[in-house]
């Protein structure tokens, strides 16, 4: 039987199968460039200093990237320095459906509106915004408002039900968080709870007296970010030592040895953020 005769006997199902295989192959070829361009290198443990954004008259929010990459189960993690200029107009922030954003006010006052409530968030206040959140923000003060934004995507899909059951988006005003003094300084406990992207997000603020260590060098499974609000510190990270000041951010990967010391002459204050 000739090749032409064989083709005549080929069933319709077989033809459909070959057509499907061609379509799948084409989709794979189209998908590979997406994989290439969305691949991020791991964020390296160490210190990243505040990068003052250049302000422009055409933008209310001006941003510079401090670090960006992946971090184990975090497909993408980015920390930015931001300035919101004074304006009589609100700026609407929309969180993408596959991201969460964590705001920390570094300087000034950030006005936000959520549902039927309005908030004036002073230095040290935080926002945790979930996928799909939309809210207006504004700076009505004379000076610019500076704030950190940590954006992240987890490898598993967002769990909106988990976030809803945990209480939804988070707004915490610094002035409403109790300070509990201890022999090394004191602590403010902000939160510990799951989110849409994370099984656990824990945040507290440590005030550490001059010349003291917060803890002996230690490790833990959760990744940790230290955001310096004031003072001068030194952080042991693995076998290296890094120095941080106001606006610096330490990134600590899972299970890396670390320990922070206040090397200044006055108390230092910093956020400690663990997530997994």
Where are the language model's segments positioned?
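Short acidic-glycine-tyrosine-enriched beta hairpin
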Residues: 116-131, 239-254
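Histidine-centered metal-chelating micro-motifs
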Residues: 89-92, 96, 111, 127, ...
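Bacterial Sec-dependent N-terminal signal peptides
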Residues: 1, 8-13, 17-47
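Ligand-binding loop in jelly-roll beta-barrel domains
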Residues: 132-156, 254-276
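Short, conserved beta-strand element in jelly-roll/cupin
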Residues: 95-111, 205-208, 219-234
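A short, N-terminal "cap"/entry segment at the start of jelly-roll beta-barrel domains
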Residues: 39-78, 86, 91-92, 142, ...
